[in-house]
A protein has these predicted regions:
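Noncatalytic alpha-helical scaffold of FAD-dependent oxidoreductases
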Residues: 1-459
Length: 459
């Protein structure tokens, strides 16, 4: 499918897509067909649905430098979106960590990054969306129009109410460089106190803070990385070659990156997960072409392992215990961060762990399917690994315990990966009554899966 380049192209493609939907069997469940290179979901799923093609909805239709907003198509990756906006000295308010996350995916499935302590999640800087609903309409949803219920109910719906074809998003001015400071703390408790102070004051040691995230390596080694835009840099590091970004956190106190490289600092090694493929071995790394050191390549390797189970077969031959994938992002209140990481460490032994503060941008907004307390500073905790299963236990042993702990601490869990909630608890957590009303209004014949079927039952 050719990329859409103009508004006229976009309107024609919308009409084509609506006609395509009319040709699909009546009553048959439908699903968006998209390439693996733009999928960042970590839940295996059974394919039982008729797919329709929206791959052509990629590209940036317009950038308004005066009003600082852009009209962007829903299947556009953040890699392409940033490439379009940076030449104008502008960027989305939140740029998720991985290049192939799409704008539409980040809005319907949530996203986060180190600007989230001041800008919230990507959906909070959306001005309006054209949404293809399950009943075949294309509706422009905005916070103050007749489809405001769809606008505020769309985040965390994961394509079960419809698909965003076009989004108008806010942009903010950026500088050419980012100055990083890596701050070490001896415990998560100390780190949590610093997170709260930095996010409230938006500075550290007299310097402005535009970005903040953290890396927990062990019970006695925890870092916060604070970043500030800079017009100049005395030197610039490059972590797309032999050097590995997350290792630099432990060895450097100051660093400078171009803004482009800062946005993608985690992508080259998929945070630290490239080690599972040998990409952090110096010899292998030299032979591994730089263009293939990126998150979507590692994702494809994961998909191959899931399909053929080679590593699991080898582990069993060696007599090693079965392991459960524990790939999750959760939000917990900052004052419960130490409790959660202590639990996670004792339960799974997963190290390192990523930490990213988050606060709702507009305290007056209500995002129905993923409600957060607007007065609370949360910390997103990201952990992407495996944990040994006790003899006789099945998948879900660790992940279900994590879900229960997050609920106990007053947090929330993102649904991009596996979930094991009982149905009643799920709907109580993720806006069940509101979701039911939205489903009736915009997908009355249930052509799209419901949220529980898609995220927990993996259909």
């Amino acid at each position: 499918m050719d990329r859409i380049a103009t508004w006229d192209d976009y309107r024609r493609r919308v009409e084509d897509l609506q006609r395509e939907l009319l040709t699909l069997p009546a009553g048959a469940p439908i699903r968006l067909r998209k390439g693996q290179e733009t999928s960042n979901l970590f839940r295996p799923r059974r394919c039982e649905h008729t797919a329709f093609d929206a791959d052509g909805f990629t590209g940036t239709l317009s950038i308004d430098r005066t009003q600082r907003h852009a009209d962007v198509l829903g299947m556009t990756t953040y890699e392409d979106l940033v490439a379009a906006t940076l030449p104008f000295g502008l960027a989305p308010l939140v740029v998720p960590q991985l290049k192939t996350i799409t704008l539409g995916g980040a809005v319907t499935g949530l996203g986060i990054e180190s600007a989230s302590f001041r800008n919230g999640c990507p959906h909070e800087s959306v001005l309006e969306m054209d949404i293809l609903t399950g009943d075949g309409r294309v509706l422009t949803a905005a916070p103050n129009n007749e489809y405001r219920d769809l606008f505020f109910g769309f985040p965390n719906s994961y394509g079960t109410l419809g698909y965003a074809l076009r989004l108008r998003i806010e942009l903010e001015p950026v500088a050419p460089y980012v100055h990083l400071r890596h701050l070490r703390f001896g415990s998560v408790s100390e780190c949590a106190v610093a997170i709260e102070a930095i996010c409230n004051q938006r500075e550290w040691d007299g310097e402005r803070v535009d970005f903040i995230d953290g890396t927990w390596f062990s019970a006695s080694e925890c870092y916060l990385t604070v970043g500030a835009y800079a017009d100049t840099a005395p030197t610039v590091s490059n972590y797309t070659g032999q050097q590995i970004y997350y290792r630099s956190i432990r060895s450097r106190t100051d660093d400078w990156l171009t803004t482009h490289d800062y946005f993608w600092r985690w992508d080259t090694d998929w945070f630290w997960c490239s080690r599972a493929f040998g990409a952090q071995n110096a010899v292998i790394r030299r032979m591994w072409p730089a263009r293939y050191r990126r998150s979507d390549v590692y994702w494809k390797l994961i998909a191959l392992e899931r399909r053929y189970g080679i590593k699991r077969w080898i582990d069993r031959r060696r007599g090693e215990p079965d392991r459960e994938e524990v790939i999750q992002d959760v939000e917990v209140p900052v004052d419960r961060l130490a409790d959660f990481i202590d639990f996670l460490d004792r339960r799974t032994g997963i190290q390192p762990v990523w930490m990213c503060p988050l606060k709702q941008r507009d305290p007056a907004a209500t995002w129905d399917l993923y409600p957060l307390d607007p007065a609370t500073l949360y910390v997103n905790v990201g952990f992407w690994s495996t944990a040994a299963l006790p003899a006789g236990e099945q998948d879900g042993y660790h992940n279900r315990a994590i879900e229960e702990k997050v609920a106990q601490l007053g947090g929330r869990k993102s649904l991009y990966s596996t979930a094991f909630y009982p149905e009643d608890e799920f709907w109580a957590t993720y806006g069940g009554p509101t979701y039911e009303l939205l489903k009736k209004a915009y997908d009355g014949e249930e052509r799209l899966l419901d949220l529980y079927a898609k995220t927990v039952q993996r259909r």
